[in-house]
Amino acid sequence: MSLYATQDEKKQAAAKAALKHLPKGGILGVGTGSTVNFLIDLLPELQLEAAVASSQATADRLKKLGIEVVDMNHVVSLDAYVDGADEIDRHMHMIKGGGAALTREKIVASIAKKFVCIVDDSKWVDQLGRDFPLPVEVIPMARSAVARKLVSLGGDPVYREGVVTDNGNVILDVFNLNILNAIDLEKTINNIPGVVTNGIFALNPATIAIVATNDGIEERTAQ
């Protein structure tokens, strides 16, 4: 029997458990997505100096709570970055980008001293990419050329109709990739001309994962 009646209750529990891993005061990097939204609603407790947002949606939610949102160009480093994931494995490698904010998420995470990932256990996987497609942000004019390259890597790219990123680009969701070496594949896809970035977060993995399971909260680190 689960401690939580719904998936949302699991997400709320993970968000609450993450607070102790985040700095009080200071500037926090904040990701995007349904789990992060639960966390954002708790952030006033931390009395942050400010936050750097990974998307316009996150920035808007932070501002509604009275939290100042600053441009990343004015920040040298962040004490922590907190975000969810579409998938995460025991190496703390992740697939992200279901909400199409992957590029800004990756940029903000890159200047953080630690990456706190908050998920429910449905996102914990043995191998990335089996159940969730890999999002790739692409400059619009390169969409078809990039898709052909992704096919040559063994993937089945699908154009995410009607979605334009905050950067004005499009998303290809790549199914059936065999992600055995996440670091190498992240590099390979990022080197395709026209790719802005892809949703593998392996070069800069999570520091700790806060995982809500049926039995409660587990804190996991790379194995």
Curated annotation (Swiss-Prot):
One of its GO terms (molecular function) is ribose-5-phosphate isomerase activity. GO terms for biological process: D-ribose metabolic process; pentose-phosphate shunt, non-oxidative branch. It catalyses: aldehydo-D-ribose 5-phosphate = D-ribulose 5-phosphate. CDD domains: RPI_A. InterPro entries: NagB/RpiA_transferase-like, Ribose5P_isomerase_typA_subgr, Ribose5P_isomerase_type_A. Substrate binds at T32, G33, S34, T35, D83, G84, A85, D86, K96, G97, G98, G99, K123. Keywords: Isomerase. The active site is at E105 (proton acceptor). SUPFAM superfamilies: D-ribose-5-phosphate isomerase (RpiA), lid domain, NagB/RpiA/CoA transferase-like. GO terms for cellular component: cytosol. It is an enzyme of class 5 (isomerase). Pathway: Carbohydrate degradation; pentose phosphate pathway; D-ribose 5-phosphate from D-ribulose 5-phosphate (non-oxidative stage): step 1/1. Its EC number is 5.3.1.6. Pfam families: Rib_5-P_isom_A (PF06026). Catalyzes the reversible conversion of ribose-5-phosphate to ribulose 5-phosphate. Belongs to the ribose 5-phosphate isomerase family. Homodimer. HAMAP family: Rib_5P_isom_A (MF_00170). This is Ribose-5-phosphate isomerase A. It comes from Acinetobacter baumannii (strain SDF).
